[in-house]
Amino acid sequence: MDDFLSISLLSVAMLVGCYVAGIIPLAVNFSEERLKLVTVLGAGLLCGTALAVIVPEGVHALYEEVLEGKHHQTSEMKQNGIASDKAAEISSVHEHEHSHDHTQLHAYIGVSLVLGFVFMLLVDQIGSSHVHSSDDPETARPSSSKITTTLGLVVHAAADGVALGAAASTSQTSVQLIVFVAIMLHKAPAAFGLVSFLMHAGLERNRIRKHLLVFALAAPAMSMLTYLGLSKSSKEALSEVNATGVAMLFSAGTFLYVATVHVLPEVGGMGHSHKPDTTGGRGLSRLEVAALVLGCLIPLILSIGHQH
């Protein structure tokens, strides 16, 4: 029951923290120039988060079990005092097994990232084709862009929730806290980036709040579902296929699609601008480039500070 209480508290903290971080751009009134600057910073945060936090976290989750298993086997051999020639023979067998595991895991990394990216690409195309058929082509693209951006981040947040739920089922408080900190490090900037992008895209404030609420609810809801839905046998099965790492890398692919295909072109003036006579076509000013770079670096600095 203690595990259930801790996962409940972490889920509530995640929901509140994410929503508060996302509401900041809405709570402050920005001029058009300030809003562009905040949007650029948010875009940088999304890109930096995808590259510096989510991909490394996913890779770490994949390799953690293999590395721990290797360490455990060597310590066991030392404790049991196995003869040196026998130990060498066993270790060579294990080395072969581990090299096989590593090649398998390399494949998981690429496949998960690409599938996440392609999934969002297909969702984007299906969404935009539906909108194109019913609406004016001028307004079709940006509206599908908003939906894709939110959907991509929600898919990512749901994968985060699975990771936290799986961590809670290990009954180790330290593991839960590490996963929670890792998730909050990128959920808060992502919420800020999502809201600033939706504001820049000209969405109404009430609808932005709804988008933010869906994004904020995704991870806590999935963490609770994962924790409650995992039986002992399914926990073992999940750990065998490294489901947490695969889920995080899949979501990293969706995150990268959202950050690079939607948010960056929009901010750089290549996408739709709701004010055609603005400076959108000229690209970014020096200050905006500095804000973009700063946004990319913030998650990197935070992730360096956060150690496993």
UniProtKB/Swiss-Prot annotation:
Glycans are attached at residues 29, 242. Its main location: Golgi. Keywords: Cell membrane, Cytoplasm, Glycoprotein, Golgi apparatus, Ion transport, Membrane, Mitochondrion, Nucleus, Transmembrane, Transmembrane helix, Transport, Zinc, Zinc transport. It is found in: Golgi apparatus, trans-Golgi network membrane; Cell membrane; Cytoplasm, Perinuclear region; Mitochondrion. The chain crosses the membrane at residues 4-24, 35-55, 107-127, 147-167, 177-197, 211-231, 245-265, 287-307. Transports zinc ions across cell and organelle membranes into the cytoplasm and regulates intracellular zinc homeostasis. Participates in the zinc ions efflux out of the secretory compartments. Regulates intracellular zinc level, resulting in the enhancement of AKT1 and MAPK3/MAPK1 (Erk1/2) phosphorylation in response to the BCR activation. Also functions as a membrane androgen receptor that mediates, through a G protein, the non-classical androgen signaling pathway, characterized by the activation of MAPK3/MAPK1 (Erk1/2) and transcription factors CREB1 or ATF1. It is a multi-pass membrane protein. This is Zinc transporter ZIP9. Belongs to the ZIP transporter (TC 2.A.5) family. It catalyses: Zn(2+)(in) = Zn(2+)(out). It comes from Mus musculus (Mouse). It holds the Pfam family Zip. It comes from the Eukaryota. GO terms for cellular component: mitochondrial membrane; mitochondrion; nucleus; perinuclear region of cytoplasm; plasma membrane; trans-Golgi network. One of its GO terms (molecular function) is zinc efflux transmembrane transporter activity. GO terms for biological process: bicellular tight junction assembly; intracellular zinc ion homeostasis; regulation of cellular response to testosterone stimulus; regulation of vascular endothelial cell proliferation; zinc ion transmembrane transport. The keyword Membrane applies. InterPro entries: ZIP, ZIP9.
